[in-house]
Amino acid sequence: MKQNSSNKAIFALALSSFCMGVTEFIVAGILPDIAKYFQVTQPTAGWLVTIYAIGVVIGAPLLSIPLSPLNRKYQLLINLGIFALANLTIAISSNFYLSLFARVVAGFMHGVFFVIATIAAAKVAKKGKETQGIAIMVSGLTIALVTGVPLGTFVGQTFGFQAVFLLIFILTSIAFIAVFIIMPNHLHGSATKIKYLILALKVPPLLKCYIITICTCGGGFVLYTYIADLLLNISHFDKKMIGVILFLYGVCAIIGNLVGGRLTDLKGSIMSLRIILVGQAIIYALITLSAYSQTMVIINLCLMGFFAFGGISPLKTLTMISAQKYTPNFTDSSISINEGAFNVGIALASFVGGIVFARLGIVFNPIFAAIFVLPALLITLKSSRTI
């Protein structure tokens, strides 16, 4: 595939990834508006977040099965088409339960999208730059965190939350058209079955990949889920500064994601993860020590964003290579479990973080974040450097 066409295809995937990211993260910023519109409590409206995450975990492995025999291009078109319609449903719905249903459908599509897009990005990328291709695709997700969510929150609070989901529908439709025009037709899928999911879980090297993903991705969320409390009550920032600090965190997350992709192409996924995991553990521990210094906590949170998102591309690459090596006949199934593992890590880490916060206080959350990533570090230290 020509370099120019390759870049266009990857950026089409990045735009799709951006739409997925905004859809996942936006509800938290407009939750009061949604609750007021549907006349439900905020905890009830919060199910729009929970049900989406459940959809991602379930959708990644299970929906890979019916889509797997199709060409990658058509997999993406079906995926984006349903995702767009789910967001349009939320934009025009006046029924909370219909919106809840649309959210779980969108979550299903989110989960399976990153299975398809990870493979597609690696296939269309220039030889030797496969991981950078994956990193650029994933950057849509991190850009959504930095720009899409703040802008979406502003739009939702100004014009109503329906406007946000209408914009997501429009952007996803543009991504659909871009994929239809640009994505090559030669990216063939491989049929998969439920039994392949079970078999993948029985392969020790892949099981190690999933544990690494859960711990590496989850670690930061032991702290991040409750970061506002740390900044307000320990570091004593003004409430207006929270958005600025999280913006800086997101910018560093984008940089970390791109650097992680480049590092993986140069050093391999295992060596990259060793570097990133050591960085994560050190930074998490330093946040506890620096929590009372506003300057140092900002610096360390920026580094936290860098290392937290720096691990995404090597995690995806490690699993993709391992799946191709150990389960060549059902690669998609093995990769789909790893996509679910990302959200398992987030959910588990948030749960652990909540217990630590309630029992010991927020200042201990960074320490437990460091502990959370240690199993992943130990596994990578004992693994071959050749992957």
Give, region by region, the residue ranges found by the protein language model.
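Intracellular juxtamembrane helix-capping segments at the cytosolic ends
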Residues: 113-125, 310-326
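Helix-to-loop junctions at the C-terminal end of transmembrane segments
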Residues: 60-72, 257-268, 357
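Helix-loop-helix hairpin linking two adjacent transmembrane segments in secondary transporters
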Residues: 94-98, 126-183, 213-216, 226-233, ...
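Helix-breaking motifs and short loop linkers at transmembrane-helix boundaries and internal kinks
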Residues: 39, 71, 92-98, 109, ...
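Cytoplasmic helix-loop-helix junction between adjacent transmembrane helices
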Residues: 102-140
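Paired small-residue
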Residues: 11, 82, 86-89, 94-106, ...
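Conserved MFS/SLC helix-loop-helix module at the cytosolic interface between two early adjacent transmembrane helices
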Residues: 58-94
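A late C-terminal transmembrane helix in Major Facilitator Superfamily
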Residues: 322-359
